[in-house]
């Protein structure tokens, strides 16, 4: 290291008078010292102040520019050297060298800029201001088709430089996308897929860019799907496959790309992985099984890709996914149930699946997870059942198959996601099914649990669904017994609160249920309706100009129904409802105006 100090002193003199031979010798000594101990040598270079002199050795005329760029690339491997390189004014001359025709100069310059940009805001900013990215992209475009090893090495360095330049920086990534880097990288991948280093660089770049929403459209207009699937089929190493997965997952969020991936044969690859890995207990295989099956489910989120794979219920992919549900592997059970939930996004698919025995498979799966079961599997299976119950024709079939009994086993669950799906499934099943609604509405355990969940302030979804199911039990059963059960369990106050919801659909469901209560069991419910301040709430809803027409209409229907109760009648009189109602006679909505006239007559007669 002593002769390093001599070299640095000598270099200071020769850098100024540019004595070529001794200059080359000094630079060779520096490179040698860096190869032996990079950190220590870099510290000495920084302390010597020589960095400032390097700018003058990076001119296009300089014969040693490649060596100087190489030295900068080596010192910039150290984090502490990156800002000093920027401060020494090296970025602008380095970017100028990107216009060189000499391959070695381009290689070392690309390395130097890439290392200076690595994890360095200052480095990136300086390269951005000097316009370095556009020149590199132009090089990638023009050199793209040349496949000799030296050129591939240069392409790899340039890709790496762009990656370091834009990594985790949305605005610089967006800049590269606007410069058209995506089609160029996809082309590179296609031509150089035999070159492992370059392929890897392209994949990492895709992984970075694919997270940006603006990139998806550009990716969709290339043949990225085809190239990635082709590459995937060739890979046997877990790490390489994992790398491709990391690009596929964000890309597959785009519906157009989902379809392209399906058409390129990705699904067949994924099914093969599942088959190979399902019985393995190796950590890598378990990870790959999860990633593969998750990606499969993601592909089914696109309507076109999902229908293509369903193939009218005859598709081999659909059949394979069905076979996952009875498997003993939790990950496959989960993916299978989620896939069914995705296939069940239109009525025709739902009807076909119910007719072909899917409900029994899902109920068997739920049965295996009742005691200390897997929450994600429970949630997925319930999601599938909920979706399957949407078509009217399926409801009676699912009820007679015993779905309500299977679902009710999860009433004791303390997991909000499971509670939420359980409630949604029951609500779908009883829609317009009077007998089922009555049976469930008289189930004291269920109603008490619903009332408890109506107070789940930490879980708005569960709270909302519980309220909606309470209301649905009354609306679809129109049963006095159901109303009595709900009154006895303390459910009335929740229905009254629901009438003030910010969601019109929920307000309306509450008002219709309350009108049925008032018509069928007013005597039983009047105390609860009074203490829940229903009359005051109705006055507020009618007086509020923002209330939707159907809310005003149903509020007036309810007011008329409440007149049969002495205490509620008195409250109506005390609140001067006539003023509010008479104003609504001129409402632009005909139904509201008519109901206002009827309500006004009723109030006048009863006063």
UniProtKB/Swiss-Prot annotation:
Signal peptide feature range: none
Positions of the UniProt region annotated as Interacts with polybasic regions in GTPases: 239-255
Disulfide bridge partners, by residue number: none
Protein name: Rap1 GTPase-GDP dissociation stimulator 1
Lineage: Eukaryota, Metazoa, Chordata, Craniata, Vertebrata
Stretch list, region Prevents binding to prenylated RHOA: 122-170
Disease: Alfadhel syndrome: An autosomal recessive neurodevelopmental disorder characterized by global developmental delay and regression, intellectual disability, hypotonia, delayed motor development, stereotypy, behavioral abnormalities, and dysmorphic features. A chromosomal aberration involving RAP1GDS1 has been found in M0 type acute myeloid leukemia. Translocation (t4;11)(q23;p15) with NUP98.
Main location: cytoplasm
């Amino acid at each position: 290291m002593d002769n390093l100090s001599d070299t640095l002193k000598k270099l200071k003199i020769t850098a100024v008078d540019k004595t070529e031979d001794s200059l080359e010798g000094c630079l060779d000594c520096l490179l040698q010292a860096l190869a032996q101990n990079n950190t220590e040598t870099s510290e000495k270079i920084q302390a010597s102040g020589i960095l400032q002199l390097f700018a003058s050795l990076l001119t296009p005329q300089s014969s040693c520019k490649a060596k100087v760029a190489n030295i900068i690339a080596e010192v910039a491997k150290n984090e502490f050297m990156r800002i000093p390189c920027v401060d020494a004014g090296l970025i602008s001359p380095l970017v100028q060298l990107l216009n060189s025709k000499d391959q070695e100069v381009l290689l070392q310059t690309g390395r130097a800029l890439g290392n200076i940009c690595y994890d360095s805001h200052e480095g990136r900013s300086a390269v951005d201001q000097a316009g370095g990215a556009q020149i590199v992209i132009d090089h990638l475009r023009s050199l793209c088709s040349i496949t000799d090893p030296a050129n591939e090495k240069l392409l790899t360095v340039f890709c790496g430089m762009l990656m370091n330049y834009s990594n985790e920086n949305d605005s610089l990534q967006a800049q590269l996308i606007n410069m058209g880097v995506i089609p160029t990288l996809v082309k590179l991948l296609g031509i150089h897929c035999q070159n492992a280093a370059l392929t890897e660089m392209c994949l990492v770049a895709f992984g970075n860019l694919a997270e940006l929403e603006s990139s998806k459209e550009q990716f969709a207009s290339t043949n990225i799907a085809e190239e990635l699937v082709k590459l995937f089929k060739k890979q046997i190493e877990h790490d390489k496959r994992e790398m491709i997965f990391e690009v596929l997952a964000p890309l597959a969020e785009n519906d157009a790309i989902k379809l392209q991936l399906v058409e390129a044969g990705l699904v067949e690859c994924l099914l093969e992985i599942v088959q190979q890995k399902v019985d393995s207990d190796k950590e890598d295989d378990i990870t790959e099984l999860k990633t593969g099956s998750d990606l499969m489910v993601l592909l089914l989120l696109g309507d076109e890709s999902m229908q293509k794979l369903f193939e009218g219920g005859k598709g081999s992919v659909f059949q394979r996914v069905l076979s996952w549900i009875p498997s003993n592997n939790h990950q496959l059970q989960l993916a299978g149930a989620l896939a069914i939930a995705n296939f069940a996004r239109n009525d025709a698919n739902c009807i076909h699946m119910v007719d072909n025995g899917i409900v029994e498979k899902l109920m068997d799966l739920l049965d295996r997870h009742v005691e200390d079961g897997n929450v994600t599997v429970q949630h997925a299976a319930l999601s599938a059942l909920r979706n399957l119950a949407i078509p009217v024709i399926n409801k009676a079939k699912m009820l007679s198959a015993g779905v309500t009994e299977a679902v009710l086993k999860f009433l004791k669950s303390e997991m909000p996601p499971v509670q939420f799906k359980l409630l949604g499934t029951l609500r779908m099943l009883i829609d317009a099914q009077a007998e089922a609604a009555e049976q469930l509405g008289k189930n004291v355990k269920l109603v008490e649990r619903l009332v408890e969940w109506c107070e789940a302030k930490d879980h708005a979804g569960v709270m909302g669904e519980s309220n909606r199911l309470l209301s649905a039990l009354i609306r679809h059963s129109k049963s006095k017994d159901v109303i009595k059960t709900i009154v006895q369990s303390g459910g009335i106050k929740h229905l009254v609160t629901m009438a003030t919801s910010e969601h019109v659909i929920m307000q309306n469901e509450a008002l219709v249920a309350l009108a049925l209560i008032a018509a069928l069991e007013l005597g039983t419910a009047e105390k609860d309706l009074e203490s829940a301040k229903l009359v005051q709430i109705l006055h507020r809803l009618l007086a509020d100009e923002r209330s939707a027409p159907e809310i005003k209409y149903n509020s007036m229907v309810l007011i008329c129904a409440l007149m049969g109760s002495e205490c509620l009648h008195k409250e109506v009189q005390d609140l001067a409802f006539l003023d509010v109602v008479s104003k609504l006679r001129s409402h632009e909505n005909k139904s509201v105006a008519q109901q206002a006239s009827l309500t006004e007559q009723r109030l006048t007669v009863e006063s």
